[in-house]
């Protein structure tokens, strides 16, 4: 994964904790600009952003190619789901490309339901009810949050 621009780094690290949460996985690696020194590199990010209703959120997960299929996505998403539950959220959801079998398998393993997106059949809406004792929510419009 390349180095993040200052603007992108600020976006990942300056968070409004009332509306969003970002979990970042990093490793120390050799710094090519300073031989013999190490630099911290982001290898994965899981985040959620609350919808206007305050009860549900959209998630995103990004793992550097070299770190995929090593359990990092599972660790980050498990922590993100647990944090969303602790925050009192009812539903967390996201969109996944229909041909992204590893991501769909991960979401299924975590208990997410997988539906074909009504607006784009090439996408899958994956969602998890965080309080299983409550009735299932109606499908959410990802653009308006309602």
Region locations from a protein language model:
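Long, contiguous binding/interaction regions
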Residues: 1-146
């Amino acid at each position: 994964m390349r180095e993040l621009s200052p603007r992108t780094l600020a976006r990942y690290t300056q968070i409004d904790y009332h509306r969003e949460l970002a979990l970042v996985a990093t490793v120390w690696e050799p710094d090519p600009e300073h031989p013999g020194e190490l630099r911290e590199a982001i290898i994965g990010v899981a985040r959620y952003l609350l919808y206007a209703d305050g009860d549900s959120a959209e998630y995103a997960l990004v793992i550097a190619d070299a770190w995929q299929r090593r359990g990092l996505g599972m660790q980050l998403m498990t922590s993100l789901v647990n944090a969303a539950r602790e925050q009192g959220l009812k539903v967390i959801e996201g969109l996944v490309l229909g041909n992204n079998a590893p991501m769909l398998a991960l979401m299924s393993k975590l208990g997410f339901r997988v539906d074909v997106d009504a607006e784009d059949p090439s996408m899958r809406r994956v969602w998890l009810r965080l309080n299983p004792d409550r009735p299932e929510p109606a499908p959410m419009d990802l653009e308006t949050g309602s």
